[in-house]
Structures are given as structure tokens and as C-alpha cells.
């Protein structure tokens, strides 16, 4: 799931990751 987000929308992936951290 993380890979899909990173591939399609890097910005959203970064935001999600930042939220987790």
C-alpha cells in the first residue's frame, strides 16, 4: 500500500508518513 501511494502520489505519501511520525 505504501509503495502504491509513493508511486501514484509522492506528496500524499510524504504527508501520510509525516503524520505517522
UniProtKB/Swiss-Prot annotation:
Localization annotation: Secreted, Cell wall, S-layer
GO CC annotation terms, alphabetical: extracellular region; S-layer; spore wall
Keyword Protease appears in the UniProt entry: no
Ligase as UniProt keyword: no
Record keywords: Cell wall, S-layer, Secreted
Role summary: The S-layer is a paracrystalline mono-layered assembly of proteins which coat the surface of bacteria.
Name assigned to this protein: S-layer protein 2
